[in-house]
């Protein structure tokens, strides 16, 4: 049995006022059963427009373990997690969503697995309490990102994980603005493993990850960890050149030896339109990479903090 740890639980929150009370109650019971400490809950309010912040402030007056990090506006889920990591002081840090779908009771299992010498133990989702369409979208999303990424990414592993202090410090040291924390968590290395965890239904409300947010997260995962789109553009260009040379050779052979010229004006126009579309598509991909480089050169902070509340004050 390893020495007792001081645990920090990082929770990004956006408009979760109804889910907060039962979630904090569950976490209170879970942390109370874990030896060591003092443990803390780092709740990051990502510019909520409902009473999430007021609910947190009321809870902090009753529970000094609750740390509130209030961001100046909505910076996004990944930025909110980074804010939590920056303010977490524990030697082990748990990252979990604030909607209750990551069951707090699974923290015991993550901690037990971590004691076998792992720096990262992530939850692999074996079931989801969502509609068939959303489950299919997530299944496809994980496999597309894992296939295109040059960093091996575990399938069906979300942000719910326990991280050692050296992993947290390594992630905090990465300078990029477009964060895909599931990828960064893998990229930093160190011993890692996953355990199966059933993802339960939301405590209340609807998911803040709509189709647009999911696409944006997928783009961050692909463009931050892969040059495959650029290489695909180059390979397609080589293939198009090879086909054009073959067609030119065939045309020359037909003219010299059979006094005939290939016909098919419609096919020619279709080929031109198709290749023009392909060029514009890959020009957009190149533009996405260039735009991300431009965003990085501005060196703006990933988030801005409005205020921090520790110990109820």
Question: What is the predicted function of each stretch?
Answer:
Residues 1-132:
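Structured catalytic core of nucleotide-sugar glycosyltransferases
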Residues 1-4, 180-313:
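Hydrophobic helical membrane-anchoring modules
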Residues 2-4, 36, 88, 155, ...:
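A generic fold-level signal
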Residues 12, 71-73, 161, 234, ...:
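Short conserved micro-motifs on helix faces and helix-strand junctions that flank
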Residues 14-18, 101, 172, 176, ...:
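Residues in soluble alpha-helical coiled-coils and helical-bundle/repeat scaffolds
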Residues 15, 29, 33, 58, ...:
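Conserved amphipathic alpha-helical interaction elements at protein-protein interfaces in regulatory
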Residues 48, 77, 81-85, 99, ...:
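Gly/Ser/Thr-rich helix-start
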Residues 69-73, 77-87, 101-184, 200-219:
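Acceptor/aglycone-binding surface of glycosyltransferases and processive sugar-polymer synthases
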